[in-house]
Amino acid sequence: MLSKFYEDIDSKLENAMLSQIESSTITCDGKSLNTLPTPKQEDVEFGVPLQPEDTQDLQRKLKPRHMQMIAIGGCVGTGLFVGSGNALADGGPASILIAFAVIGTYVLFTTSALAELSAIYPVSGSFYTYFSKFIDPAWGFAVGIQYWLSFAVTVPLELTVAPLIINFWNASGPVSIWISVFYVIIIAINIWGTEGYGEVEFFLSIMKVISVIGFVILSIIIAAGGVPTDDRGVIGVSYWKQPLVFNNGFKGLCAVSVIAIFSLSGTELVGLAASEAKNPQKTVPAAVKQIFWRIFLFYIVALFMLTLVVPSDLPGLRTSDNSNVLISPFVIAIQLANIRALPSIMNVVILLSTLSVGNSASYAASRALFALAKNGYAPKIFNKTNKRGHPIYAIAVTLLFGSIAYFTEAGVGGALFGWLLSICGLSTTFIWGSICLAHIQFRRAWKIQNRKLEDLPYRSIFGVYGSIYGVAMTILALIAQFYVAVFPIGKKPNPVDFFQAYMAAPILIISFVAWKFFRRTSFVRIEKIDLSEGAHGEQKQNLEPVINIPVEEIDFPMKVATKESMKNVEKNAL
């Protein structure tokens, strides 16, 4: 009964996506896009080198409703519910809105470019295979390794955070018990496979959407003085008064921008999931369109309401203020209104959101490692799948990273959190910038080879200019990160803070130089890019190079071609 209900939802969503993309998708020049071609049964994968489809491929089991909810709430978790406390304390309410709005446009432009690439090349490993194809194989390797590593360490990161959130209830017992509970749950979901990931994210994302909407409504009531137990009365915009509105000035804005990037990391998972989505040419672009609502609802609206009901100078907002417990500012907002029971309910939501991020991270890391092996960037054993199409060895290695979380039992939880976070944070900036650069290169190759934009199955609504903006934002984000790393807020400059903030950069550079040295790779020349390689279904046939032979060179009246006419044909063909 329940499965039939979900099948009906999937069918209706798919029909809605088809209608939306075929009839109402608009480009930046105001023209309608062409109808998407029906993909063939075979799934064409590409990499460096290109490998034909074989039995060692991922299966397309993510349904339209899965893709929709992954796009809306897939990676909403620690960054929003916990990291927003640091953002509010470091930058104040105005800096939060400005930073998240600007970084939000950065994400929108990036994911729109990714949707264009994913629609024509829905491949395993998604975006960093584009880096190898359109930028440099060494860059694809370096970014791919860092992307895998960043999500692999996110698993123990979330396992480390979970007990700190549970300590809100003054939980007793060893931390390792709570780590083990969540560790086992994540392992069980991974054993379930792609279906498990999709179903868990579907329900947890619904929970997060309902919770955030509920928080927004409650915050309006609190700010208006409608809660009888809140002795503050009508709050209004009193927390937006100077000097709290722009804490720490420009440095505070830079610090919040860095937090915003971390909070929005994982948005590109829609592109990674393309390799296991049913009908990715249609579901991926349609899912990407939901990202706008994710950013607007979860971040802009929710954080604005948070700034109205929680003062930025309140002690305990920063994660470093408490060594054994993490209290979300969303929970603090409810506590300040003296509402009983509800803080615990909100804390449960945040705890489950942590599980959601850990689940998404293990999925992303295992699929990234699978793609690295498939493209010759990692040992071939990680390219193997079981009969259900699950990369079992890649999953096993990824899950082993979760054991790092047990170091919290030794009393180094806070320090471990910081170092793991350092690997995750900056890598997101490199990923987004590389996606935009690959899209620019793709468009250049498309133009040089005299292709028409109308022939693309999906076009980025921001065009190539959106990707140029994305590359520029990447440079500015790296500068902001460097500035905050050298001059941290509330501290004197020290090497530990700097390396925690910028450790991802040397990892990327070392990986790039090493691969380039040992494999002697070179930057990809635009005119030599084979646009048909790796294209999906009918798109591959449409992109095959056509040899135009002048009709007059062939002697039609003759039954047998002369040597001279054949030489002319061969000459024109070459």
UniProtKB/Swiss-Prot annotation:
PROSITE patterns: AMINO_ACID_PERMEASE_1. It comes from the Eukaryota. GO terms for biological process: amino acid transmembrane transport; meiotic cell cycle. Gene3D superfamilies: Amino acid/polyamine transporter I. Keywords: Amino-acid transport, Meiosis, Membrane, Transmembrane, Transmembrane helix, Transport. It is a multi-pass membrane protein. Its main location: membrane. It is found in: Membrane. GO terms for molecular function: amino acid transmembrane transporter activity. The chain crosses the membrane at residues 69-89, 94-114, 173-193, 202-222, 291-311, 391-411, 412-432, 470-490, 498-518. GO terms for cellular component: membrane. Belongs to the amino acid-polyamine-organocation (APC) superfamily. PANTHER family: AMINO ACID PERMEASE (PTHR43341), AMINO-ACID PERMEASE MEU22-RELATED (PTHR43341:SF44). This is Probable amino-acid permease meu22. The gene is meu22.
